[in-house]
Amino acid sequence: MKKIYGEKIKAVVFDWAGTTVDYGCFAPLNVFIEIFKRRGIDVTMEEARKPMGKLKIDHIREMCEMDRIKNIWSDKFGKVPTEDDVNELYAEFEPMLFETLEEYTTPIPHVVETIEKLRKNGLKIGSTTGYTREMMNIVEPNAAKKGYSPDFLVTPSEVSQGRPYPWMCYKNAEALGVSPMSSMVKVGDTISDVKEGVNAGMWSVAVIKGSSELGLTQEEVENMDKEELKAKMSIVSKKFKEAGAHFVIETMAELEDILIKIENETIKSDFVPENDYILLTPGPLSTTKSVRASMLKDWCTWDVEYNNLVQDVRRRLVSLATQNTDKYTSVLMQGSGTFSVEAIIGSTISKDGKLLVIANGAYGKRMKDICNYLNIQFVDCTFKDIEAVDLNVVENLLKENKDITHISMVHCETTTGRLNPIQEVGKLAKEYNKIYIVDAMSSFGGIEIDVEDFNIDFLVSSSNKCIQGVPGFGFIIANKEELSKCKGIAKSLSLDVYAQWDTMEKNNGKWRFTSPTHVVRAFYQALLELEEEGSVEKRYARYKENQFTIASRLKSLGFDTLVNDNAQSPVITTFLYPKNAKFEFMEFYTYLKDNGFVIYPGKLTDIDTFRIGSIGEVYPTDMERLADVIEKFINR
């Protein structure tokens, strides 16, 4: 039999109730309603279904936190539900569910035959659930008798956290022997299912008929007026897409077509040409083939699918930036990173404001240029390019210039590769009640930053740096309260951050002017790949190892580094020309390029240097190969 999929996609992980068995996911529903009813609280079907897919005790806990239920509980018992109440409810829930669970193990239509086809194409079948292992000890064998049995099952009680966390999916990948996560598909029927798959870096497919989200019996679906059913399904589909589902299907019979589509999307990357060289620069940088392949499709800026993707990107950026996601928002701005730096300075500092510009490199100094162009008052706090920021000097300027309203500085100054003390300056900003702007262009996504912990009001970065997208837009992580005060301040039509934010909020991700659609789609793919790598912590570790590898190898060849190790970033390293050797940079550059590597010239005017970046789709083995090429150049 010729495979029509299964070359790129290796496994499908299914949910249980509402996806593969128990049409409509009714087994736990009535029990959730009953345990509250026993306490004189009538919960609605919608309330009982909303947390579906989660570990059942977490489901009960979330119901207890719903405003209406919590208020009724408080009126009846004189207090809001406590953790003891949650445990008591669960203690009743579990035995009641056990009594009826066996009745809800019949496979949903099209499941058994679809999975048989998947296996014939060589796919492995995994599963996750919101049930405990004890519950699944009833469901799993009974479903097997009726024709459905996956290759692997993991329950929330066997990992540190259930949905929407990705840990159960990771367990499936390990048990099934499948990697990367992008070669796996998650299929489910709840919002938490969708998020589980997305958070795991998998393709996420949501099914409507039989789902908990639709909440109808098979008989109701078959007998309902077609237009009424269509309207209900449309609402469910929208919820799934807003949660991040890549595809939404009506029934499991459509899954094969989706797998073929995913396979073809993945195969596109096979037709993306290899790069002629590795970019060892601080951005633009080397990207994955899958990021480049994601730009092969055209997108309409008005289309809801594209705008939903924009909203998803915005949410993911805020989640990368802070744990307090309610306090911050993100705004995407067309253009290079400097466009966004100019936009935030011009959109937040009024004619009566004054900016303290802390600079020890070209990109800090560029902020002064922006102020001069925009006629913004500023206090100059410039250090030499090879100097560290002196916090005493910064604080003295704050004391001497009480009319300063804002502070700005660069986190990773790629002029030298130095990391600046943004957290310490953030403490000063808070102490002196100043608005704090950080240019984290070459660090965000590659070095852990929590904007709330660092007291950052506005953080600026761009698509083509540590998140490993391509050039085309910048973005601002903004304190909502401070951004809301900025209406009418902007000194530019197209660089008005407040207006861009307002439009994106009111129009579900729409940009004010034409957006770089292909770049946004590539950035979304890059975000998924960052999550798949293990988020910022793991990417930082890789970048750090890259930097250490090339720095240590080149030091052994006579190339000293400019910045001390304690201030050296993992982003880019500035090397001094070797002593006692004839060294001509363009000859060196050309030799490296001919051998598959592109580096940066130095940016200092009074010291002979060159720079090597360590970010992007680059690994320590690449740095070892680069060092070997440099050694051959030196020893010619």
Swiss-Prot record:
Its cofactor is Mg(2+); pyridoxal 5'-phosphate. One of its GO terms (biological process) is organic phosphonate catabolic process. The keyword Metal-binding applies. Residues 1-276 are annotated as: Phosphonoacetaldehyde hydrolase. Signal peptide: none annotated. It holds the Pfam family Aminotran_5. Involved in phosphonate degradation. Homodimer. This is Bifunctional phosphonoacetaldehyde hydrolase/aminoethylphosphonate transaminase. It comes from Clostridioides difficile (strain 630).
